[in-house]
């Protein structure tokens, strides 16, 4: 009997939510609806004749193809998924449309499975990716999600028909980890495979997820240029402090102050902190990978919109007290433009690599360089840990204050630090779990390479069990976390099981022996 392998756990629902492409860009996955027909027609019209022929085996009108994709078969199970992005169309909005909250998105990929008949456990699967987005992992993503949904709904086997020259689709199936059975006849290839999760398919899922996550966080940890939106001439303002901390701690790349008021004063050179200022991120003529938003809460969405139009890859929002609707709009806006989001309510990011010195936030100075990475949901706790590290000489490789963690979470950071050569120990201050199953899967895997040390307020038997099962080391408080971190960071592991106790008192020796 084959060994049961639990299915992988995406960050969001299988059928809908943000997804990451292989190049780190974000997009939106959701089920297709009849209302999507106009967008489907536009999508199909943009495809090359070859792409349409590969999917439908002949030249076909976009309108007819859209109707085929949306057609429901009575009594049969059909799942049709779309991947959408607004990274190009949002930039074409008018000011009035932006004020009205218009968020046009275009379809860049579609995938579906259709049950062979009522009660059947087999289904035909197919997917289609826009030419300019091919090679970014969308085919693998759609196959992965369709298979997970199919298993949940009683489907056990997929089969697909494709032209023999459609090497890209065949490669997607080969790279999936499923055991394939193929038959070729008259220039067509039929591929069939069981879709129950296996150790190999789980490993492929985790690899795809890890590659996409790491790529998406590169602009945060290795930005080519940083813009401070809301940079001010007032030394007491947050924008001034952030700009000052970036410059005084010698970030190697360019820093761009953005402040409409400073840039539009008649008769004055537009400067903030002796640096040329810009009225908008869109006016910066050089690449901006990371934008730090420090504006008032009513200006955050407009600032993020400008970042999206400029092609910024990562946004960190220090502004607090956003309303729930503003947070939802901010999250959707960043996802639509393909930007990763830290915050809102973050207190900053520190990168302390040999090649990057980034002190982007309210921490006034970099801690010593070291191999400890830290993530904190509490900004105050995070800054206290950074300050303690600086006072005691405890070296940090990086630090992220997550804030509201509506996008980037500790799960994302764990995957980045897993691949980070500068990091050997991961510290987490957790107040809540966004996705406990996913955290458990990641902690178990990453913990085999690098220790995970966690501080979490309160006691919960379920959480305690999760930590024990995944090998996570829990510290009772911050003081204990510092002690354990120093031990793990600087004390090498024993080479063998032989341990000697040296003491000047019998009692402590007995206690130490029992602990061993």
Task: Describe the function of each predicted region.
Residues 198-516:
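Catalytic-core regions of core metabolic enzymes
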Residues 2-219:
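Long, contiguous binding/interaction regions
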Residues 1-2, 422:
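An N-terminal domain-start capping segment
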């Amino acid at each position: 009997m084959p060994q049961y392998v639990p299915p992988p756990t995406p960050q969001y629902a299988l059928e809908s939510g943000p997804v990451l492409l292989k190049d780190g860009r974000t997009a939106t996955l959701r089920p297709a609806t009849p209302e999507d027909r106009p967008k489907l027609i536009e999508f199909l019209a943009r495809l090359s004749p070859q792409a349409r022929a590969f999917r439908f085996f002949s030249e076909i009108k976009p309108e007819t193809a859209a109707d085929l994709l949306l057609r429901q078969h009575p009594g049969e199970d059909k799942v049709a998924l779309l991947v959408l992005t607004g990274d190009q169309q949002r930039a074409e909005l008018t000011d009035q449309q932006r004020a009205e909250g218009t968020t046009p998105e275009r379809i860049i990929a579609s995938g579906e499975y259709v049950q062979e008949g009522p009660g059947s456990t087999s289904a035909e699967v197919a997917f289609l990716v826009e030419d300019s987005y091919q090679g970014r992992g969308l085919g693998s993503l759609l196959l992965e999600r369709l298979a997970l949904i199919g298993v949940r709904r009683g489907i056990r086997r997929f089969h697909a028909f494709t032209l023999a020259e459609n090497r890209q689709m065949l490669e997607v199936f080969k790279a999936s980890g499923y055991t394939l059975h193929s038959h070729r006849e008259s220039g067509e290839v039929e591929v069939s495979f069981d879709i129950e999760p296996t150790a190999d398919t789980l490993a492929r899922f985790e690899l795809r997820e890890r590659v996409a996550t790491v790529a998406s966080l590169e602009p945060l940890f290795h930005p080519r240029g940083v813009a401070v939106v809301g940079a001010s001439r007032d030394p007491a303002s947050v924008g001034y402090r952030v700009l000052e901390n970036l410059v005084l701690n010698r970030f190697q790349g360019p820093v761009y102050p953005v402040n409409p008021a400073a840039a539009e004063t008649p008769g004055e050179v537009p400067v903030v902190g002796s640096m040329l200022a810009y009225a908008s991120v869109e006016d910066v003529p050089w690449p901006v990978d990371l934008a730090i938003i420090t504006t008032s809460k009513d200006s955050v969405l407009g600032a993020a919109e400008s970042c999206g139009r400029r092609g910024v890859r990562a946004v960190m929002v220090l502004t607090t007290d956003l309303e729930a609707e503003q947070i939802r709009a901010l999250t959707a806006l960043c996802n639509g433009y393909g930007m990763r989001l830290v915050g809102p309510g973050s207190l900053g990011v520190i990168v302390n690599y040999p090649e990057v010195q980034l002190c982007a936030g309210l921490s006034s100075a970099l801690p010593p360089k070291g191999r400890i990475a830290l993530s904190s949901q509490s900004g105050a706790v995070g800054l206290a840990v950074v300050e303690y590290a600086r006072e005691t000489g405890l070296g940090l490789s990086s630090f992220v204050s997550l804030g509201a963690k509506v996008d980037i979470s500790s799960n994302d950071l764990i995957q980045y630090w897993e691949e980070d050569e500068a990091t050997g120990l991961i510290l987490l201050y957790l107040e809540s779990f966004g996705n406990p199953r996913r955290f458990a899967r990641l902690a178990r895997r990453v913990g085999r390479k690098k220790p995970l040390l966690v501080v979490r307020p309160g006691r919960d038997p379920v959480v305690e069990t999760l930590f024990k099962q995944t090998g996570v080391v829990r510290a009772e408080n911050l003081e204990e976390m510092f002690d354990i971190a120093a031990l793990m960071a600087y004390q090498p592991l024993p080479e063998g099981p032989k341990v000697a106790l040296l003491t000047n008192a019998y009692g402590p020796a007995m206690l130490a022996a029992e602990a061993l």
